């Protein structure tokens, strides 16, 4: 099989209610979908978070992929990486890596369908049949009260989640501590509770809030400082009274290497739609395991990203190695976004659904999901469709 056509769809959907975090406020959800068609008509789907990466994907990357064999994913990845590095510099970070991620995920889906096997088997086979997920929600909302916040948190417990994550960094330190304290009281001591600052603090502020939260059994403190500030992560790793997590915005194994080799995290969080797709994320995960750092992937997209992450996470070895393994302790977990997202909720006919905090790995070919192209086209903005069939 040869790759015949690459299409992209820029999707935007308004949401209600809107919500915020330390770096912004969301009133819409954005996504870039990638559809790759083989010369036999087989289709694979991918996605990336960087909507501005559409022009990079269409003009620079797609022509390099047309005419290639989708079974040669490593070769295609290196071909894209070399060209991205040449045009965009700095080891294909930024929009280049986002575009590569979308194409790469679609190639794995396409290849799996062509071979008649699920992506997890193409990645080496499952270590576990089910993957643990935690609820990501508890954002800042308009007219928020501790009562509404705690009602949301208790809802996640009742839905079977064994862990959840809330935001810090938008309010004063004392106000955020009060939010976290209210959540902990509402959910009890048996549920894992994580906090995410989205890079809101400097080292001293991160230490201040961490000390104030030390009595609330925080499972990890995510992105307290700028994602590229290695020295601050190294300091906080040794000083914080709770584990440190990060890495969701890093691109390719080359950016991850400097953090992993120095053991700057307790938990690393690559995002398959940002870091370089399944091809490079698998390398990143192996690197992390060798460094004794648990992988707990970041996910912030549609069922395409969820499916890709389920398949890859099912193949990851326990960290640390153990005969009897427990999610959160040895087995990886990844986040399941619970905020409003019409794109996630409408474009797939057979979405992955959690039961008691676990998602069962699909055994269907490729990613194991069916994309409803009619719904994709409904959400595609005017001028947001591109098609490339011309080889570089």
What residue ranges belong to the model's regions?
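A cross-domain feature marking catalytic cores of carbohydrate-active enzymes
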Residues: 48, 93, 135-137, 166-168, ...
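Conserved, mostly hydrophobic/aromatic
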Residues: 3, 41, 61, 103, ...
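Metal- or metallocofactor-binding catalytic centers and their adjacent structured scaffolds
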Residues: 36-114
